[in-house]
Amino acid sequence: MADTAHINDVPMQGKGLYSSHAALQHEAMLKALPLLQQATNTVVTNVNRNLRPLTVVEYGSAHGNNSIQPMVTILDSTPPGDIQLVFSDRPENDFNTLSTTVTTWAEGLDKAKFPHSIFPAMIPRSFYRQVVPSRSADLGFSLAALHHLDHVPKSQDGVDHQALLKRQAHLDLLQFLKLRADEIVPGGSLVLSFVSQSSSGRENYAGLVDACRNAMIDMVKDGTLPGAVAGSFYVPTYNRTLQDVQKVIEEVIPTWIAHEVFEQDCLHPAKKDLELQKSSDDYDSDEASRRYADVVVDWLMAVCAGYFLKAVKVGSDNTFTGEDAEKFLADWVKRTKHFFYKDHRDEDVVCSFIFVRLERV
């Protein structure tokens, strides 16, 4: 594999595609709102800003669709005054969509309810680097992003690849917390949520993963997709366990106080919609099941599609055009929906998340 293949430089799908298919992330975000409220109360109580603006940084904003409610929750618990809201993501992110999302929201705020003077900013930088100046932030948060690794560790003879990913995930989270400790003032807070391994042993959205895998195998078997492309497809994530996270926190205890660290499952809301449809008079089970398959597969593809397009380039040494790659992708999506409907009809799409609330000492 070429060195460029190890770099995690693939953004979520742009032009609003990711933001249109981030419903499960939205469910996880809602579960993080009480932590953000508590974190904001801690900041308001602990931090003497000396007339400087309150600064809030989001690490991994994507298109901003799941950034707004957290920011509203923070504003709700913050006294009137100047507040800087920083939205950050990798340089490859679709910042045009993010800008539209943030600007539309900020300009439409009810000034009677939110008399704050709001100063939005966007920073194109990975959260595995320092994002804002040292001791300039009061509150930080990152939702549904930290399971994405900085890069894919290169294979080592005699070392299990999962062990390499586990080590990389440990180093990444440790680096993330050390960087945020530089940026966030003493008394400040940090709230995190990210995809995790369920302590029950249940695999996250197993049916979807199986359908994706079978669809790609099907494309290779019938000669549609080169095997080298399928072999190059990889999503550089690692789902940590609670124990993994606690080990990292133990290493930063002199700098951070951990107030809450817990695991919780999130169900894709399309399943609730499906159950509601079953009670309607004009319920068509086949149509409803196909629509459910469309929604949950589109959700997963909003994250995976960019990595698939990268695999087409890497696995073919750039012999395919962008149009070719998009055709491969459309075929893969179509087949994945077919396999999910056939083999996992109406199956729950559940994902485990870890939630963390930290205070900067």
Curated annotation (Swiss-Prot):
Protein's recorded name: Methyltransferase LUC1
Enzyme class per UniProt: transferase
Phenotype seen when the gene is deleted: Abolishes the production of lucilactaene and NG-391, and leads to the accumulation of demethyllucilactaene and (8Z)-demethyllucilactaene.
Pfam families attached to this UniProt entry: Methyltransf_7
One of the protein's GO biological processes: methylation
Functional note: Methyltransferase; part of the gene cluster that mediates the biosynthesis of the mycotoxin lucilactaene and the lucilactaene-related compound NG-391 that act as cell cycle inhibitors with potent growth inhibitory activity against malarial parasites, moderate growth inhibitory activity against cancer cells, and no activity against bacteria and fungi.
SUPFAM superfamilies in the cross-refs: S-adenosyl-L-methionine-dependent methyltransferases
Entry's EC annotation: 2.1.1.-
Domain of life per record: Eukaryota
Family: Belongs to the methyltransferase superfamily. Type-7 methyltransferase family.
